[in-house]
């Protein structure tokens, strides 16, 4: 399994130690923002398509103001890195299979028309689906023993663009005819959601002998769950092309869900929720907005949940220094000099992020990502502490601090497992660092996707939960952006009473919760970046209570 110690698995910046690892990383919005985000790779080639060999060559035609922003990067990235630039993920070896139980043609679904109550005809479901197909394999539970419930796996195909997204569905252990459906997304960007399946909240985990171990607190105890490897070239997904921004990924997810619920209408009538962590703080506002934008849809979206997410960088990056310096509920990791240095760097960082927010331009957003990650995450990371859990050191740098990732990768690379799931690629990787880099260099990292949340709140509830021991997407920053968000319910939300979170019958609380209208924030005690891994029973408790509408607007 190819993993670089400096790269973030679940959603922190791969540029956190950019100064030390720049060459390795480089080689190895909507509306105005969407228009401005042209591929930065275009700027690193001349008119004939040949790569430039230095910053001077690439940026000689820029204005003085733009050059000044990029001078920050010039100090961090060696010229030699430009000689090996590659902007497309290398396609994995793969072979197409033909042993599928179902194949759903997007063109057929798009061609279905219905009449409304007034006799007017319209498409049964909206969206451009003609280029998509969904392939479905009924997984034999006895082959893998991950769970005994009904399971499906397969691929969403975008044949025109050679994109193939892998998914794995687990039916609810309880009452699948009535229980809700959840789509789970890990972050990265570029990390497999099968990480969430086996390391956090799925029906089983993998031990060091590659044995499957049952999880009594799986999120499919009372809900059916879809785990999706997205964007393409992540996990078991593959493509000859690439996706390098969140908005493009949203189109694929809408198509997947539409075709899946068309094939399985018994699940389409259930409540549907999107949940994820880390960079899913970017994904989920965009994916939810994409779904809600379609009036005629078969996706019964009822809420979204974001755990330890990166959603509003301008607000969240201010809270790295307090978390590292003893103000987040845990002892300080950094000394006074380093804390002062982070304080000194913050105004420049916020200025760069604000420029990104206002322009949406890749030329503003990339410098913001690199400078801020180096200044705000780099000092902490250089201590050797776990960026996902402030309570201890990074114990397995070859697996991004968690040996369990290695076990999962070894398990999923077994041919018997791949055959049982209908996998078409030759290998599984937990994270694709080309994707991580491409999102960074498309300016996606600092895009203000939190601005989509107020519109979402008009239609469905939103839960932001955060393990309070995480550094990389810490609870201080997540609480801060929820309180800073401009929406009609802001005043009431900020004034809402903070209540204890407790298991039924327990005396001691496991966290705090604040809710008003459709907005809820939770702090979960003694949990790092991956709350379901660190607090499995407690996370299942708040999930079930959320699905039952405990904190929804009445």
Swiss-Prot record:
One example GO MF annotation: serine-type carboxypeptidase activity
Protein name as it appears in the record: Carboxypeptidase Y homolog A
EC number annotated for this UniProt entry: 3.4.16.5
Family annotation (InterPro entries): AB_hydrolase_fold, Peptidase_S10, Propeptide_carboxypepY, Ser_caboxypep_ser_AS
Family: Belongs to the peptidase S10 family.
Stored Gene3D superfamilies: 1.10.287.410, alpha/beta hydrolase (3.40.50.1820)
Residue ranges listed under propeptide: 18-137
Major site of localization recorded for this protein: other
Matches recorded under PANTHER family: SERINE CARBOXYPEPTIDASE CTSA-4.1, SERINE PROTEASE FAMILY S10 SERINE CARBOXYPEPTIDASE
Example GO biological process: proteolysis
Species classification: Eukaryota, Fungi, Dikarya, Ascomycota, Pezizomycotina
Keywords: Carboxypeptidase, Disulfide bond, Glycoprotein, Hydrolase, Protease, Signal, Vacuole, Zymogen
Annotated active site: 278, 470, 529
Biological role stated in the UniProt entry: Vacuolar carboxypeptidase involved in degradation of small peptides. Digests preferentially peptides containing an aliphatic or hydrophobic residue in P1' position, as well as methionine, leucine or phenylalanine in P1 position of ester substrate.
Disulfide bridge positions per record: 191-431, 325-339, 349-372, 356-365, 394-401
């Amino acid at each position: 399994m190819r993993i670089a110690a400096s790269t973030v698995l679940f959603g922190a910046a791969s540029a956190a130690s950019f100064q030390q690892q720049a060459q390795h990383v480089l080689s190895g919005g909507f509306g105005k923002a969407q228009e401005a985000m042209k591929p930065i790779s275009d700027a690193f080639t001349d008119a004939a398509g040949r790569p430039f060999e230095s910053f001077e060559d690439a940026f000689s035609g820029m204005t003085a103001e733009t050059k000044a922003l990029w001078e920050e990067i010039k100090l961090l990235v060696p010229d030699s890195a430009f000689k090996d630039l590659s902007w497309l993920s290398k396609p994995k070896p793969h072979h197409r299979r033909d042993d599928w139980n179902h194949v759903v043609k997007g063109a057929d679904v798009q061609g279905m028309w219905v009449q409304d109550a007034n006799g007017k005809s319209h498409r049964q479901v909206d969206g451009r689906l003609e280029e998509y197909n969904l392939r479905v394999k009924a997984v034999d539970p006895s082959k893998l023993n991950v769970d005994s419930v009904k399971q499906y796996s397969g691929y969403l195909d975008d044949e025109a663009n050679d994109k193939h997204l892998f998914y794995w569905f687990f039916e609810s252990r309880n009452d699948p005819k009535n229980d809700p459906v959840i789509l789970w997304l890990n972050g990265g960007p570029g990390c497999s959601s099968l990480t969430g399946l086996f390391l956090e909240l799925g029906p089983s985990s993998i031990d060091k002998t590659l044995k499957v171990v049952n999880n009594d607190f799986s999120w499919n105890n009372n809900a059916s769950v879809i785990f999706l490897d997205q964007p393409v070239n992540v996990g078991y997904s593959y493509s000859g092309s690439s996706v390098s921004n969140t908005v493009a990924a949203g189109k694929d997810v809408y198509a997947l869900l539409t075709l899946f619920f068309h094939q399985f209408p018994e699940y389409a009538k259930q409540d549907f929720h999107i949940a994820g962590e880390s960079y899913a703080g970017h994904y989920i506002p965009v994916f939810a907005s994409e779904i809600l934008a379609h009036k005629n849809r078969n996706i019964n979206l009822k809420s979204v949940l974001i755990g330890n997410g990166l959603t509003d960088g301008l607000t969240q990056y201010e809270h790295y220094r307090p978390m590292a310096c003893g103000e987040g509920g845990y002892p300080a990791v950094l000394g006074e000099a380093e804390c002062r240095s982070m304080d000194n760097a913050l105004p420049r960082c916020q200025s760069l992020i604000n420029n990104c927010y206002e322009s949406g331009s890749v030329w503003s957003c990339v410098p913001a990502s690199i400078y801020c990650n180096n200044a705000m995450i780099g000092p902490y990371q250089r201590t050797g502490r776990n960026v996902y859990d402030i309570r201890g050191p990074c114990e397995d740098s070859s697996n991004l601090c968690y040996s369990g990732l290695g076990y999962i990768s070894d398990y999923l690379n077994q041919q018997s497992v791949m055959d049982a799931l209908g996998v078409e690629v030759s290998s599984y990787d937990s994270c694709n660092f080309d994707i991580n880099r491409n999102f960074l260099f498309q300016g996606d990292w600092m895009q203000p996707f939190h601005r989509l949340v107020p519109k979402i709140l008009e239609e469905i509830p939103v839960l932001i939960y955060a393990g309070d021991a995480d550094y990389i997407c810490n609870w201080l920053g997540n609480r801060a952006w929820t309180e800073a968000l401009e929406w009609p319910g802001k005043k009431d939300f900020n004034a809402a009473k903070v209540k204890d979170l407790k298991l039924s019958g327990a005396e001691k609380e496991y966290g705090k919760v604040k809710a008003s209208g459709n907005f809820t924030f939770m702090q979960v005690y003694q949990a790092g970046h991956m709350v379901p891994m660190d607090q499995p029973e407690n996370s299942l408790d708040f999930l079930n209570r959320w699905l039952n509408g405990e904190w929804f607007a009445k």
